[in-house]
Amino acid sequence: MAVPKKKTSPSRRGMRRSHQALTGEAYTECSNCGELKRPHHVCGHCGHYDGREVAAAGNSGRGLKGVVRV
């Protein structure tokens, strides 16, 4: 089996792991209703995207579950 010839230094180990950092999810305000939504996604509360209504929320009261396209 292959075995490392030298011990990996903490600096090299850190440089290798520098791309593994986690970032939190970004949220923006819906321009129609003011609720928080993901950027570039349809608002789950009112169904608007980019100033237009693209989906109507069903009567279930659970956001866009059972979406009806407009």
Curated annotation (Swiss-Prot):
GO molecular function, one term: structural constituent of ribosome
Coiled-coil residue spans: none
Ribosomal protein listed as a keyword: yes
Biological-process GO terms, alphabetical: translation
Biased composition (Basic residues): 1-19
Xref: HAMAP family: Ribosomal_bL32
UniProt xrefs under NCBIfam families: rpmF_bact
Name of the protein: Large ribosomal subunit protein bL32
Organism lineage string: Bacteria, Pseudomonadati, Pseudomonadota, Alphaproteobacteria, Acetobacterales
